[in-house]
UniProtKB/Swiss-Prot annotation:
GO terms for cellular component: cytoplasm. Fruit specific. This is Linoleate 9S-lipoxygenase B. It comes from Solanum lycopersicum. Its EC number is 1.13.11.58. Residues 34-158 form the PLAT domain.
């Protein structure tokens, strides 16, 4: 430095060019209501010189021929004087970079080092006026822990997307090293500051150390129990079975490892409370049990059930109530469970009974919910009569249906069965084959007595579905090889026969709720998406355009899945309230055997189920055979919008099929996704090769569809329909009342009590309703389809304009949904219960709304 420069430095003069930056972050005390002193401690560290530094990395000038040139460190200014209230959100800090007189070029990334003692959530860095360039924006959205926690530097890249081959040379090594850090080395227990994405089987569903009764099969890694992989945690193995992973004690269940950036990042406290409650619901069990002990384990009338919503029920005084008030905050009790904090439990009235308390019992509503309810993805067209089973007859004997022409002929509006089949008027809700293989073991439980069901329906002239017959089957008492013992029930509305028909429909609903929760919802959205989350972070750099496309659709998925494993799907969790009981996850593994990735596309699914046929003259290339099928009608519009958006996006970055084929990150991603993430399916011929732009478009469209619209359609109607459990019971405690039994005689005098005793046990009902109500809520910071959490998510203008078009398409779909819902001619859109179909309405407000399509499987 010259003498003049030394003098200037002493006098505080510095004529070197400066570049101003603006950093937006959230301090730990904003997002951690327990450790509210974190910001003060970090302020003291800052005062003592332990600051937060940033070094820019040139994206155009090499330092040593390989890596981009580094700027001198610059430090966040005024940390100590920035006093952020607990309720506040973002904090903004200035940072000033000395601009080297030598050519630095254009910054393409930066290294940040946190020398404080606590982590913070870094949202973005914006360089306001880079010489010869202008503004540069870095989207970060990541937790930055103290530097000593990391084995490598924390690096963030500017919001310019690059294919691997197009990455500027100075950034390539940084890009590669970041992916290496995210992959980890596959060893050791992972801690909260680790950023490692890796795979594991579902080997943490049981607790074999507590005894054989608490053991559960390992899902994944075998032909008997194939399953998608989950994120690895590296917890210690159990003592009883070294192949099983130990579990956290319940109070620590929120601490299960997921990469820190995958954890909930809610800003609003009530959203945090709701998330916490997902792991605290087990605390309610003792109080619920006490309540049920005081008023033995059943409701006596439908008025008792309605009182849960209209008046509330008093939880008994004692240690149980104290356990609730000690372990669950008053905000949760008041805002989420709607108690008064003094033990009065009250739930919001579900939509299905808001307008009419009894319309749910009608046959029309029973059929309508197969098209517009919470599980509208199972109904299929009947193509052979009687229905035949696909179960192996050498193992299970004759499993074909016993429904005959005589059961249905007089209900077909003058058509014969063959004529009804040929005219596409017969449909089936078929639970038989997925339930029957486990039913003998399920029914050995003291609390569960279920059937395997088939339901036949007729499509009427007004486009509603009329149930014709319900077949309920049990395993043959002499052994599986002897087939089934089946009985067929037909509609009736008076006397004991009418009550029996209501029972038959309820047994169908029990099957449907179990399959809905375990297969349609959990397996086919939550579980199958997690390997995509892991593979994307391991192999697609944040610079990669496909990472930028898919990343919003993975928000919070690993975290909610980890919570589900800890509190819902494990032994003693949610399975206690579903009819398959301890065999719940085993049933979902059986269903995964038939999972086919290309068939998750909505048009392919509708064709497979026979509810649509190919028709190139139709808007979506297929024609629905049930014109008033709200899920399919709205779903096809959403599907087409997603496909259009993905097509435009992919064409911008991939100019030819060769570009797809030679994308090293993309090919590594797809290879590992097939061979590791969905490793039990790796040899299936149906996997796309991902060699063309069309294959890339189709795969990304399916991924986004599953994570957004499919999940929304299957999840956010849960409380609307199943919040009133008589409509969608999850358990059946007894078999059908038979003539001569006490229950059959009681049907003559008090059929409602027998129904409730069979299908709505108090303890399980209270737990179920609590779970449904909490999990059906939208957070205040939810990001919906067609939205991004940052408007500057990419620098490329063409994708931004295409994304605006996507948002406009979704807005138009909202308007069409509202118009169709207002037309009474579309009977299935509201039905006898007058609940408009809004589950595929793209946007929503906060809370319990029964509408809205979040970008991701986030709850």
């Amino acid at each position: 430095m010259s003498l003049g420069g030394i003098v200037d430095a002493i006098l505080g003069k510095d004529d070197r060019p400066k570049v101003k930056g603006r950093v937006i972050l959230m301090k730990k005390n904003v997002l951690d209501f327990i450790n509210i002193g974190a910001s003060v401690v970090d302020g003291i560290s800052d005062l003592l010189g332990q600051k937060v530094s940033i070094q820019l990395i040139s994206g155009s000038v090499n330092y040593d021929g390989l890596e981009g040139k580094l700027s001198n460190p610059a430090y966040l200014e005024s940390w100590l004087t920035d006093i952020t209230p607990i309720t506040a959100g973002e904090s903004t800090f200035s940072v000033t970079f000395d601009w080297d007189r030598d050519e630095f070029g254009v910054p393409g990334a930066f290294i940040i080092k946190n020398l404080h003692l606590n982590e913070f959530f870094l949202k973005s860095l914006t360089l306001e006026d880079v010489p010869n360039y202008g503004k540069i924006h870095f989207v970060c959205n990541s937790w930055v822990y103290p530097a000593f926690r990391y084995k490598s530097d924390r690096i963030f890249f500017a919001n310019q997307a690059y294919l691997p081959s197009e990455t500027p040379q100075p950034l390539r090594k940084y890009r590669e090293n970041e992916l290496v850090a995210l992959r980890g080395d596959g060893t050791g227990k992972l801690e909260e500051w680790d950023r490692v994405y890796d795979y594991a089987c579902y080997n943490d569903l049981g607790e074999p150390d507590k005894g054989e009764e608490y053991a559960r099969p390992i899902l994944g890694g075998s032909s008997e129990y194939p399953y998608p992989r989950r994120g690895r945690t590296g917890r210690e193995p159990t003592k009883a079975d070294p192949n099983c992973e130990s579990r956290n004690p319940l109070p620590m269940s929120l601490d299960i490892y997921v990469p820190r950036d995958e954890r909930f990042g809610h800003v609003k406290k009530s959203d945090f409370l709701t998330s916490s409650l997902k792991s605290s619901l087990q605390t309610l069990l003792p109080a619920f049990k006490a309540l049920c002990d005081n008023t033995p384990n059943e409701f006596n009338s439908f008025a008792d059930v309605l009182n849960l919503y209209e008046g509330g029920i008093k939880l008994p005084e004692g240690p149980w109530l104290k356990a609730i008030t000690d372990n669950i905050s008053s905000e949760i009790l008041k805002d989420i469970l709607q108690t008064d904090g003094q033990g009065l439990l009250k739930y919001p009235t579900p939509q299905v009974i808001q307008g009419d308390k009894t319309a749910w019992r009608t046959d029309e509503e029973f059929g309508r919910e197969m098209l517009a309810g919470s599980n509208p993805v199972l109904i299929s067209r009947l193509q052979e009569f009687p229905p035949k089973s696909k179960l192996d007859p050498t193992i299970y004997g004759n499993q074909n249906s016993t429904i005959t022409t005589e059961h249905v002929q007089d209900k077909l509006n003058g058509l014969t069965v063959n004529e009804a089949i040929k005219s596409n008027r017969l449909f089936i809700l078929n639970h038989h084959d997925i339930v029957m293989p486990l039913l003998r073991k399920i029914n050995m439980s003291a609390n569960t007595k279920a059937y395997a069901s088939r339901t036949l329906l007729f499509l009427q002239d007004d486009r509603t579905l009329k149930p014709l017959a319900i077949e309920l089957s049990l395993p043959h008492p002499d052994g599986d090889q002897f087939g089934t013992v089946s009985k067929v029930y037909t509609p009736a509305d008076q006397g004991v026969e009418g009550s029996i028909w209501q029972f038959a429909k309820a047994y169908v609903a029990v099957n449907d709720m179990g399959i809905h929760q375990l297969i349609s919802h959990w397996l086919n959205t939550h579980a199958v998406i997690e390997p995509f989350v892991v593979a994307t972070n391991r192999h697609l750099s944040v610079l990669h355009p496909i990472h930028k496309l898919l990343h919003p659709h993975f928000r919070n998925t690993m975290n909610i899945n980890a919570l589900a494993r800890e509190t819902l799907t494990y032994d003693g969790g949610f399975e206690t309230s579903l009819f398959p009981a301890k065999y719940s996850m085993e049933m979902s593994a059986a269903a995964y055997k038939d999972w086919v990735f290309p068939e998750q596309a909505l048009p392919a699914d509708l064709l497979k189920r026979g509810v649509a046929v190919e028709d190139l003259s139709s808007p979506h290339g297929i024609r629905l055979l049930i014109l008033d099928y709200p899920y399919a009608v709205d779903g096809l519009e959403i599907w087409a919008a997603i496909k259009s958006w993905v097509t435009e996006y992919c064409k911008f970055y991939y100019k030819s099929d060769e570009t797809v084929e030679k994308d090293t990150e993309l090919q590594a991603w797809w290879k590992e996704l097939r061979e590791e993430g969905h490793g039990d399916k790796k040899d299936e011929a149906w996997w796309p090769k991902l060699q063309t732009r069309q294959e890339l478009r189709d795969c990304c469209t399916i991924i986004i569809w599953i994570a957004s619209a499919l999940h929304a359609a299957l999840h956010f109607g849960l409380y609307s329909y199943a919040g009133y459990l008589p409509n969608r019971p999850t358990l059946s405690c007894n078999l059908m009342p038979e003539p001569g039994s006490v229950e059959y005689e009681e049907l003559k005098t008090n059929p409602d009590k027998v129904f409730l005793k069979t299908f709505v046990p108090q303890l399980q009902s209270l737990l179920e309703i609590s779970i449904f109500e909490v999990s059906s809520r939208h957070a205040s910071d939810e990001v919906y389809l067609g939205q991004r959490d940052s408007i500057e998510w990419t620098k490329d203008k063409e994708p931004l304009v295409a994304f605006e078009r996507f948002g406009k398409m979704l807005s138009d779909i909202e308007n069409r949904i509202m118009i169709m819902n207002s037309h009474k001619s579309w009977k299935n859109r509201s039905g006898p219960v007058n609940v408009p179909y809004t589950l595929l309405f793209p946007t929503s407000e906060e809370g319990l709304t029964g509408k809205g399509i979040p970008n991701s499987v986030s709850i």
